[in-house]
């Protein structure tokens, strides 16, 4: 058996790369692209300080609190009201600048090397006692990205491979994951010929390749079947083994032999210790694509009807934000009708007064009903187009609301009265009163719905009880008279 062929670590894409990336690569540097939003600076700092971009909002708020504490130091760099500047900085639609970068360097006790296009970088020393260094790339548009050395890329590729393999081996319990990754990414490995290593019972335990690589074969007791019908799997069902011919071939090996892939190539690249993928960027782009396609609110400033957010009612008190549910959005997206949870009423507010909830309070929408097949396949990382063929049609107006009630949802019982019905006056025959139907205060009020309004009774019930029904978008009201026995139930509107 020959020696193992060594592979060099590489990034995900090698073709059609940016000239700036090639310039940095020749100098043993790698630029990790960030999502093009206003939180790019805080994503970069969160990744290099906390090893994850998911804490970018917490890093933003730590920066705001630090600048508020050291206001004597940073106020002279801000033109205008400093408190208003910090208030806007706390919102995710406000981009960070060099001023915030300097504040976070003092906060986390780090100096920084700032790279620009076709520049080797300049060292900015905030304090000689700071031992650690941030490597940040900044373009002319004020967008920030992470710069890594090739040694960091090699280490990150190994850590990424270990994380994905733990997920697919120990959580999903797929058989022969290493073999599948090699089969999908390096098919030439198996063209030179293979051999099997057997144990004392005659079972194949390892696959040996001519280039020196070997792959441990899993046993059916510790894995689950990949086939749709596990009863037809000869690996996990020994009674179907045809004279031992396919007994040692796992369902993973059977799929590969039939030119079927068990998971996507992106997942296979993530499990390769010689490749580094920008998983955060691809995941964020995929999440935004699905949100645009299915009309899903993901907790940003692209609000949808039914989304829970925060509203600023008093322009003089920006620190007071009330929780609300968006009921409707006009076509120009300048005014929104919201239901104030604290006050229990509907209010028309400008769209600029709405702000998303903090990430720790935001609850993602459950849109499994809109793409059940796609959600099931994404759990296993498979590439399938079955979800797109289930009748899902992309929303032609993604800015409008999805046809679903806002969360949380009670048990709404709306009653519609047609506007063409002529007014009815005078007493009618007696009928047994029913339980009054109260409109749900959180529901989206549509044209034609009405609200029961009745004056409270002070004394004994009169001979005739009048109930007024206010019909929206109609020039009249309906008055119904009922007999006094039994007395009609009282009903008060929450509006």
UniProtKB/Swiss-Prot annotation:
InterPro entries: OTU_dom, OTU_OTU, OTU_Tudor, Papain-like_cys_pep_sf, Peptidase_C85-like. GO terms for biological process: apoptotic process; regulation of apoptotic process; regulation of signal transduction. It holds the Pfam family OTU. Gene3D superfamilies: 3.90.70.80. SUPFAM superfamilies: Cysteine proteinases (SSF54001). GO terms for molecular function: deubiquitinase activity; K63-linked deubiquitinase activity; serine-type peptidase activity. The keyword NADP does not apply. Residues 375-404 are annotated as: Disordered. Residues 302-364 form the Tudor domain. It comes from the Eukaryota. Residues 395-404 have a biased composition (Pro residues). Keywords: Apoptosis. The keyword Transmembrane helix does not apply. Residues 375-389 have a biased composition (Polar residues). Residues 29-150 form the OTU domain. PROSITE patterns: OTU (PS50802). PANTHER family: OTU DOMAIN CONTAINING PROTEIN (PTHR12419), PROTEIN OVARIAN TUMOR LOCUS-RELATED (PTHR12419:SF115). Putative OTU-type deubiquitinase. Catalytically inactive towards all diubiquitin molecules and long K48- and K63- linked ubiquitin chains in vitro. Potential modulator of apoptosis. This is OTU domain-containing protein CG3251.
């Amino acid at each position: 058996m020959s020696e193992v062929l060594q592979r060099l670590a590489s990034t995900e894409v090698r073709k059609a790369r940016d000239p700036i990336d090639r310039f940095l690569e020749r100098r043993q540097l790698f630029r990790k692209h960030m999502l093009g939003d206003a939180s790019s600076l805080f994503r970069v700092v969160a990744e290099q300080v906390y090893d994850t971009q998911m804490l970018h909002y917490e890093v933003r708020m730590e920066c705001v609190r630090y600048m508020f504490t050291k206001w004597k130091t940073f106020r002279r760099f801000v033109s205008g009201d400093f408190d208003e500047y910090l208030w806007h900085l706390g919102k995710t639609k406000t981009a960070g600048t060099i001023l915030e970068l300097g504040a976070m360097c003092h906060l986390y006790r780090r100096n920084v090397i700032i790279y620009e296009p076709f520049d080797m970088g300049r060292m900015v020393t905030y304090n000689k006692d700071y031992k650690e260094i941030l490597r940040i790339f900044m373009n002319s548009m004020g967008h920030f990205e992470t710069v890594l050395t090739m040694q960091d890329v090699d280490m990150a590729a190994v850590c990424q491979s270990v994380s994905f393999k733990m997920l697919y081996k120990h959580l999903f319990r797929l058989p022969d994951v290493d073999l599948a990754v090699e089969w999908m990414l390096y098919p030439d490995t198996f063209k030179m010929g293979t051999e099997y290593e057997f144990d004392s019972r005659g079972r194949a335990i390892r696959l040996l390749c001519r280039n020196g690589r070997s792959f441990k074969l899993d046993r059916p007791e510790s894995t689950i079947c990949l086939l749709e019908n596990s009863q037809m799997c000869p690996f996990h069902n020994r009674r179907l083994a045809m004279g031992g011919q396919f007994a040692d071939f796992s369902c993973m090996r059977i799929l590969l032999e039939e030119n079927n892939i068990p998971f996507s190539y992106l997942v296979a690249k993530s499990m390769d210790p010689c490749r580094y993928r920008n998983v955060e960027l691809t995941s964020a782009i995929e999440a935004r694509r699905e949100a645009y396609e299915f009309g899903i609110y993901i907790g940003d400033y692209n609000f949808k009807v039914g989304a829970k957010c925060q509203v600023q009612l008093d322009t003089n008190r920006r620190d007071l934000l009330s929780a609300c549910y968006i009921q409707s959005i006009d076509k120009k997206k300048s005014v929104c009708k919201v239901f104030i949870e604290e006050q229990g009423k509907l209010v028309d507010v400008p769209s600029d007064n709405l702000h998303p909830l903090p990430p720790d309070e935001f609850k993602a929408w459950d849109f499994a009903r809109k793409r059940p097949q796609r959600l099931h396949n994404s759990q296993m990382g498979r590439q399938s187009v079955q979800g797109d063929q289930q009748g899902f049609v992309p929303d032609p107006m993604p800015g409008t609301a999805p046809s679903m009630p806002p969360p949380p949802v009670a048990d709404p019982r709306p009653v519609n009265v047609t506007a063409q019905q002529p007014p009815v006056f005078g007493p009618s025959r007696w009928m047994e009163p029913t339980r009054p139907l109260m409109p749900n205060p959180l529901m989206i009020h549509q044209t034609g719905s009405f609200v029961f309004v009745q004056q409270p009774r002070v004394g004994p019930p009169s001979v005739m009880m009048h109930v007024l029904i206010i019909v929206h978008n109609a020039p009249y009201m309906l008055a119904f008279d009922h007999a006094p026995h039994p007395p009609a139930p009282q009903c008060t509107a929450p509006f």
